[in-house]
Amino acid sequence: MKNIEFMKEYLEENLVKGRYLHTLGVVETAKDLAKRYGVDIKKAEIAALAHDIAKNLSSEQLLKIIEANNITLSVDEKNTRELWHSIVGPIVARERFGIVDEEILSAIRWHTTGKENMSKLDKIIYLADMIEPSRDFSM
């Protein structure tokens, strides 16, 4: 797996500035929550860094990855392009950063919608994304 600095450099180059700053805020929020709730801080940091890795891909790029990986979208997912980055995110994180930890990949996958029986890490990334101090829901 790539190191944290490599991940930050890649994200700074590939996300719009506001999204990158949001990502750094999610990292700090996730680390604080992980510390508080006894979750591996390094896993929280990695998942938080990668949670929006696919956010700035075009709809066409996202759909191409979805189709190439034989992912079946629900009706709601098909009609809500804003969810596609979280569906594709784990695939891009695995390819770009070499992330293979299923717990981290799950946290990336479910950071927008949540799901039943979420792990503590899933919950931390979901919450950190929503509550990080600089969050701007217009991005």
Briefly describe each language-model feature range.
Residues K2-I4:
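Non-catalytic terminal extensions that flank enzyme cores
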Residues H22:
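N-terminal glycine-rich anion-binding loops that anchor highly charged ligand groups
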